[in-house]
Amino acid sequence: MWQSFRTRPFSRTPALGSEAHSIFVTATDTNPLSAEPELVISEYAELFVSGLTVINQLTLGKTYVCTRDDSRVPGEGIPDVEFKQFKGPHPAGLAGTHIHMVDPVSENKTVWQIGYQDVIAIGHLFSTGQLMTERVVAIGGPRTSSPGLFKVRVGACLDDAVMSSSPNLDNARVVSGSVLSGRGSEPTKNYLGKFHNQITILEEGNHREFLGWQKPGFDKYSVTNIYGGSWLKGKLFPFTTSTGGSKRAMVPVGTYERVMPLDIL
């Protein structure tokens, strides 16, 4: 279970014998179509508390449990375990955001991060002496016929995992993880990633639209109001894997600064 921890900076497995200034438990998730961690933790409340107690002994500093502002996660009262609440859209649920706001790292200061399901697995190991071989994942996306939460094996084959929810995968891309940071299924990488709590299924955007740039775009989503679809508030759009064109330069017009919570630009 040691590889469940990741160092910040650099997101590496901690060296044996190393020590963290603090440990961050990510118990919130703002990725699109992700599961609500509170629901999963409630099914394994005792194991989660047991896991918190174990990992809290790995640092002389504090263990921060980062949750959504209105969630109720067990573990209050454990010495040196402090709960931090975050509110807002993605990336409010990312460990990097939490660390930047609570205990920023530097070249001489390292913290560790671990996901809530790995905390449950550690609690299971120390409570039963056996490895936990299952994980709860959210399966969703425009090509999913029956989205929901499913229990799958750790490292499960992606095609097998989505078979019950999406039997037809023609011209679809199965993504291990979020559409924002996940990994597309490939013949040699057709398995659930170690740190992924969701599987997303998208339509392959492998077709070109003739003179699409001249159309009003009422069927397209837009953040910057360049398409007519931006007038249709509340409408859901079936996203595909298309990026709408080739790679382009990042032009400093303030768009990225509005969605970047960290002071790095």
Kindly give the residue locations of the regions a language model identified.
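Buried, small/hydrophobic-residue-enriched core segments of structured protein domains
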Residues: 1-265
